[in-house]
């Protein structure tokens, strides 16, 4: 029985503990040829010739960081018929005869180095050539049901470019095949769709000098738990919540910009009040938790003392949001999953906040909640709980038909806004909302008229608007005009295009 090769402890490019071994399963053949090239040797290079018999000479590329960690004794184990080459020597005329053998633990632990090497190998001369005869295009990772993709697709067409949907799970080889048909002016990824954990897709775009825009709609550090490489710091990042700009830059992100959500085009086409039963109701639309909540936060502990502090702050009209939990727990935001513990605190606090507000509201006014079934386990029976509604279905008519729409902003986004902050007004509805610094994108004299900090203020606000219908109509008209002229997805995309100097 063969002994399992010993593992050598190392530090990954992120400074995390890892290990490498010479196990046979650690090597995969990417391409066959007459001249073998090892993309990483592993800790026992003397074994490789026996593992790949039939060749007289071998070439290899090694990651400088791993080479340094393995030290001089490792170099002495490299057979004399192994010749080191640099990635710059991977040019098309040389690669035709080469057989590439990838040492996979090297890729896993040092992805920034190896994804660039792999991109050089995968990109054929056809992919490197430009296509001047093709119309300017934009790649969008996702499908017609993906978050914001329908809105982005539609508006890109209106701006004179050709949107092309790319399957997020296409893989680097398929991506290169797509690129051979034509290179886009830009790649857009919403919430890191299509951005694999090691950065193989990004390295391909980077090699072709194609800018990649990462639009992080949700909490960026929650999204980044899926990535195992720093490649995201080299993309152009857009965040809907400007609180995250400073911490993202602290991790080395070179370009981070504030790009809020906006109104979806379909909501401007709302047909008006077609649900008269809602005209005297306050309506809340939203889930009790985001999909996949349990698995995402499954390993997170609770912090009862901090949760008690958070409840006290809620009673004082303050927001114990993600920023507050970050200060109190002071755990690393990235890499790793500890950030989820701070998010879990914000998630639990946010649910309590929604429960408090909806219960207080239901004591005085008729309330309808459109959401998931779990609300029935959380809210009192006098609240009318209706099933979730399709975003592209009856939601616009619910917004326009209701007496008012209540928004309660997610605690995961300290300065965040929701889609409702824009869509409700576009549909000729009326919104009241808890106050966050995200409202600073609107004129403050308008934002003050619709926002509250504490449940008591929420009730006073509704009372005032019910007494003064002319004021309510005036606010509604001003917000509709504001959203239509300054807060559409077309304008958000124009911001991206102008920043990156992309023309239709």
Language-model features and meaning:
Residues 57, 73-89, 97-99, 161-162, ...:
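Active-site regions of enzymes building and remodeling cell-envelope glycoconjugates
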Residues 133, 140, 151-160, 164-168, ...:
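Catalytic binding pocket for nucleotide-activated donors in carbohydrate/polymer assembly enzymes
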Residues 1-137, 144-151, 155, 159-163:
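N-terminal donor/sugar-recognition subdomains of glycan-related enzymes
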Residues 38-52, 71-72, 127-128, 141-249, ...:
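Extended catalytic core of nucleotide-activated donor transferases of GT-like folds
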Residues 73-76, 94-100, 227-232, 270-281, ...:
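Short, surface-exposed amphipathic charged segments that create phosphate/polyanion-binding patches used
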Residues 32, 183, 233, 400-401:
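Alpha-helix C-terminal capping/helix-to-coil transition sites in glycosyltransferase folds
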Residues 113-155, 254-413, 433-439:
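Nucleotide-sugar donor-binding catalytic core of glycosyltransferases
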Residues 36, 187, 212, 236-237, ...:
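Short, well-ordered beta-strand core segments
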């Amino acid at each position: 029985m063969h002994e399992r090769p010993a593992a050598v402890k190392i530090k990954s490019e992120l400074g995390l503990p890892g290990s490498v071994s010479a196990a046979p399963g650690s090597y995969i053949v990417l391409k066959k040829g007459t001249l073998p090239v090892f993309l990483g040797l592993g800790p026992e290079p003397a074994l490789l010739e026996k593992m790949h018999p039939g060749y007289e000479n071998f070439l290899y590329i090694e990651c400088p960081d791993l080479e340094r960690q393995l030290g001089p004794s490792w170099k002495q184990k490299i057979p004399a018929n192994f010749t080191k080459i640099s990635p710059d020597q991977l040019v098309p005329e040389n690669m035709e005869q080469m057989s590439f053998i990838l040492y996979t633990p090297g890729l896993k632990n040092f992805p920034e180095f190896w994804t660039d090497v792999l991109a050089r190998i995968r990109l054929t001369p056809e992919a490197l050539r430009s296509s001047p005869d093709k119309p300017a295009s934009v790649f969008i990772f996702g499908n017609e049901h993906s978050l914001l993709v329908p809105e982005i697709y539609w508006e890109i067409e209106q701006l004179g470019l050709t949107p092309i949907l790319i399957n997020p799970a296409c893989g680097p080889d398929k991506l290169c095949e797509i690129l051979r048909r034509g290179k886009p002016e830009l790649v857009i990824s919403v919430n890191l769709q299509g951005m694999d954990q090691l950065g193989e897709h990004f390295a391909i775009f980077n090699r072709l000098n194609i800018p990649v825009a990462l639009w992080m709609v949700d909490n960026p550090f929650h999204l980044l738990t899926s990535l195992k490489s720093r490649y995201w710091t080299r993309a152009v990042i857009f965040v809907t919540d400007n609180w995250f700009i400073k911490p993202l830059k602290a991790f080395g992100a070179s370009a981070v910009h504030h790009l809020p959500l906006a109104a979806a085009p379909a909501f401007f086409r709302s047909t008006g009040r077609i649900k008269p039963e809602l005209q005297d109701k306050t309506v809340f639309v939203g889930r009790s938790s985001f999909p996949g909540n349990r698995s995402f936060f499954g390993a997170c502990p609770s912090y009862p003392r901090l949760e008690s502090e958070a409840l006290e702050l809620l009673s004082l009209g303050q927001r114990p949001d993600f920023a507050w939990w970050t200060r109190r727990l002071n755990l690393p935001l990235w890499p790793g999953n500890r950030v989820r513990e701070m998010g879990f605190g914000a998630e639990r606090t946010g649910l309590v906040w929604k429960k408090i507000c909806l219960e207080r509201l239901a004591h005085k006014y008729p309330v309808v909640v459109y959401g998931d079934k779990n609300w029935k386990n959380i809210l009192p029976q006098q609240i009318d709980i209706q099933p979730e509604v399709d975003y592209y279905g009856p939601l616009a008519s619910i917004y326009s038909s209701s007496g008012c729409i209540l928004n309660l902003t997610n605690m995961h986004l300290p300065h965040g806004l929701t889609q409702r902050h824009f869509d409700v007004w576009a549909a000729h509805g009326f919104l009241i909302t808890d106050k966050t610094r995200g409202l600073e994108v609107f004129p403050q004299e308008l934002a003050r008229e619709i926002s509250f900090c504490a449940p008591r203020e929420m009730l006073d606000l509704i009372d005032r608007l019910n007494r003064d219908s002319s004021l309510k109509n005036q606010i509604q008209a001003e917000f509709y005009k504001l959203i239509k002229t300054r807060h559409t997805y077309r304008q958000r995309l124009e911001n991206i295009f102008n920043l990156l100097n992309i023309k239709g």
